[in-house]
Amino acid sequence: MVDFKSIIAKVATGATLTRDEATDAFDAMMSGDATPSQMGALLMGLRVRGETVDEITGAVTTMRAKMLPVTAPADAVDIVGTGGDGSGSVNVSTCASFVVAGCGVTVAKHGNRALSSKSGAADVLAALGVKIDITPEQVGRCVNEAGIGFMFAPTHHPAMKNVGPTRVELATRTIFNLLGPLSNPAGVKRQMIGVFSRQWVQPLAQVLKNLGSEAVWVVHGSDGLDEITLSGTTAVAELKNGEITSFEISPEDAGLPRAPADALKGGDAQANAVALRAVLEGMPGPYRDVALLNAAATLVVAGKARDLKEGVALGTQSIDSGAAEARLKKLIAVSAAA
């Protein structure tokens, strides 16, 4: 068993943990072998210094080892944001997920209830009529029969209950805010991940490379959005063929118009569900455009589109043909029958 006191002592000096030390420390926390004081000390020590790629890689290794897995096709994708960007926006990645699924790409989406907005992925899906409190086996059925499934984080990461109270008491962002999107229970190797701060764009791409991902975009909008934004440029770190490259994109690269961040302000789960359904039914406007933009990037990651413009064309067809909305209806039906 790890000597947790020595781990804290090391972090207290400003030293960094090796990947193995981080794996062991997080195993102790998630197994209930560390006290609340010890967990709080380590989490804040890491936060104040700044978590390293090795520390995050080790922590994710533990998260993945303890999660309840879902069976999904090898080419499935996830579209997820860390949340916590404070924007209170509509549910961009959730809407984009249905657009991508409507293009014939399997989506295994991992998410939770709201962090800083009034409506997280789980909240809006429940409001749409999707049953989210289902078993991993039932989620697998959704993925395979509907082409899209939603993995509700608390169901798949039961060991998180050991750190939950400490996280609530700390009431500030910790490494765990980064770990969720990196710990997809379906083990997807193609990911489109939005982060709440630009400082994490490159490091998280490196973490996913360390953990065997094949194709990844990690993004952060210049307006603070944990998605690709319409209001300005978006920083991207792309993992492709084992190499990570960094660049910026703008809506114009996808042939889409810009829109101010306020145009994407969301409401509660019910209001966001109405807005999402309207997009899938063909309503034009900034919400449709931002969903198309994020779907396009995901289609590039999936190898379905060569570039953003082709991705937007495919996404447009997905919505206008009714295919995206059909994926939602199928997910509601399959999850209800689960």
UniProtKB/Swiss-Prot annotation:
Protein name per the record: Anthranilate phosphoribosyltransferase
UniProt keyword Magnesium, yes or no: yes
Binding positions for anthranilate 2 per the UniProt entry: R167
Residues that, per the record, bind Mg(2+) 1: S93, E227
Keywords: Amino-acid biosynthesis, Aromatic amino acid biosynthesis, Glycosyltransferase, Magnesium, Metal-binding, Transferase, Tryptophan biosynthesis
Cofactor: binding details: Binds 2 magnesium ions per monomer.
Family designation: Belongs to the anthranilate phosphoribosyltransferase family.
GO biological process entries: L-tryptophan biosynthetic process
Residues binding Mg(2+) 2, per UniProt: D226, E227
Organism: Rhodopseudomonas palustris (strain ATCC BAA-98 / CGA009)
SUPFAM superfamilies the UniProt entry points to: Nucleoside phosphorylase/phosphoribosyltransferase catalytic domain, Nucleoside phosphorylase/phosphoribosyltransferase N-terminal domain
GO molecular function: anthranilate phosphoribosyltransferase activity; magnesium ion binding
UniProt key word Ribonucleoprotein: no
Reaction equation(s) it catalyzes: N-(5-phospho-beta-D-ribosyl)anthranilate + diphosphate = 5-phospho-alpha-D-ribose 1-diphosphate + anthranilate
Enzyme Commission number(s) from the entry: 2.4.2.18
Amino-acid positions noted as binding 5-phospho-alpha-D-ribose 1-diphosphate in the UniProt annotation, renumbered to this chain: 81, 84-85, 89, 91-94, 109-117, 121
InterPro entries: Anthranilate_Pribosyl_Tfrase, Glycosyl_Trfase_fam3, Glycosyl_Trfase_fam3_N_dom, Glycosyl_Trfase_fam3_N_dom_sf, Nuc_phospho_transferase
Pathway named in the protein's UniProt entry: Amino-acid biosynthesis; L-tryptophan biosynthesis; L-tryptophan from chorismate: step 2/5
Binding site for anthranilate 1: G81, N112
Quaternary state and interactors: Homodimer.
Domain of life: Bacteria
Names of required cofactors: Mg(2+)
Residue stretches in coiled coil: none
Gene: trpD
